[in-house]
Amino acid sequence: MSSMDNTMKFNVNEEPVSVDVQEVLMSVYEALEEKGYNPINQIVGYLLSGDPAYIPRHKDARTLIRKLERDELIEELVKSYLSQHRKSLE
């Protein structure tokens, strides 16, 4: 059996996040909107690639988003989505 057939376990550090993820995402979203970008596309591009060039320097958005690890951002997005939609799945 190849390693591609095995499920890998991903463990997230349970350290408290010193930066508020929601606050960062909202600030970055607003900065992207102000610059005329599609905020969702740009944030997804950043999350998938890790390339900060997807996020403008406008309003320090690039600096803000880089204060968080991408896995922390993704974890918060998944938690938020599931907490809002879980009842509709049951």
Swiss-Prot record:
InterPro entries: IreB (IPR009309). It holds the Pfam family IreB. Belongs to the UPF0297 family. This is UPF0297 protein BH1268. It comes from Halalkalibacterium halodurans (strain ATCC BAA-125 / DSM 18197 / FERM 7344 / JCM 9153 / C-125). The lineage of its organism: Bacteria, Bacillati, Bacillota, Bacilli, Bacillales.
